[in-house]
């Protein structure tokens, strides 16, 4: 369980909305142990992003512009702050738990203007089904015909078949491994 204490040293018990005790766990269900002091008093700390001191939003010291930065203390003693660039910085516990910048399926793509934009679910599916290539990396294909063309008409069983338009589900099934084309 978490060994959290308030300013006076009294233990803080973590409970849910109904008053039941809560066991902290990570995203994999493993139990977590947190210790610290929960305080509502403003805490001043040095910025790790530069030479900017970060202050709580209530009262910045005299001579410091109000837009310099803001800090808020959570119950676990973990301080989160937001600098004027709009980037959020997580202190203490957040500094130890880093998140990888790489991902197997990207949720954003280049917007063509030097920035990033969030991909739609349709774009994500296209990326997955398109062999993993981005639309920038796909090689363009061109078809050219030279010489005279002839038209032939066929009669019999081949002419009686007509292609039905494939639905999205059929297209996805074709891309799955182990799928064999069983059309009559």
Curated annotation (Swiss-Prot):
InterPro entries: Dehydrin (IPR000167), Dehydrin_CS (IPR030513)
Low complexity: compositionally biased ranges: 60-86, 139-159
Biological process terms in GO annotation: cold acclimation; response to abscisic acid; response to water deprivation
Keywords of this entry: Repeat
Keyword Ion transport (UniProt): no
Top-rank taxon: Eukaryota
UniProt-listed Pfam families: Dehydrin
Feature: compositional bias, Basic and acidic residues: 87-98, 122-138, 160-177
GO molecular function, one term: metal ion binding
Keyword Zinc included in the entry's annotation: no
Cellular component, GO annotation: cytosol
Region (Disordered): 49-184
Task of the protein: LEA protein are late embryogenesis abundant in higher plant seed embryos. There are two subsets of LEA proteins (5a, and 5b), the first ones are expressed when the cotyledon weight reach 80 mg and the second set are expressed above 100 mg. The function of those proteins is not known.
Similarity-based family: Belongs to the plant dehydrin family.
Protein name: Late embryogenesis abundant protein
